UniProtKB/Swiss-Prot annotation:
The keyword Chaperone does not apply. It comes from the Bacteria. One of its GO terms (cellular component) is cytosolic small ribosomal subunit. CDD domains: Ribosomal_uS17. Belongs to the universal ribosomal protein uS17 family. Part of the 30S ribosomal subunit. This is Small ribosomal subunit protein uS17. It comes from Rickettsia prowazekii (strain Madrid E). One of the primary rRNA binding proteins, it binds specifically to the 5'-end of 16S ribosomal RNA. One of its GO terms (molecular function) is rRNA binding. Keywords: Ribonucleoprotein, Ribosomal protein, RNA-binding, rRNA-binding. The gene is rpsQ. One of its GO terms (biological process) is translation.
Length: 77
């Protein structure tokens, strides 16, 4: 089964080896036919602490690293 890859923006890099990535997606509401923007935050593993706030990154699913971390930063976009 292929791993999911998401694109988002780093909104926090205060913790050691972890960044918080905000991923936004747009979809059309089934009843109102209006495009709705929904965002979700993911904790991603950053081994080298090289990503800063505002960076656009790709994250990929991985094995559980901690209680809330199951994503790893793949690369900078």
């Amino acid at each position: 089964m292929p791993k999911r890859v998401l694109q988002g923006v780093v909104i926090s890099s205060k913790t050691d080896k972890t960044v918080t990535v905000k991923v936004e997606r747009k979809f059309k509401h089934p009843i109102y036919k209006k495009f709705v923007k929904v965002s979700k935050k993911y904790a991603a593993h950053d081994i080298e602490n090289k990503y800063k706030e505002g960076d656009k990154v790709s994250i990929v699913e991985s094995r559980p690293i901690s209680k809330t971390k199951t994503w790893v930063v793949l690369n900078l976009e």
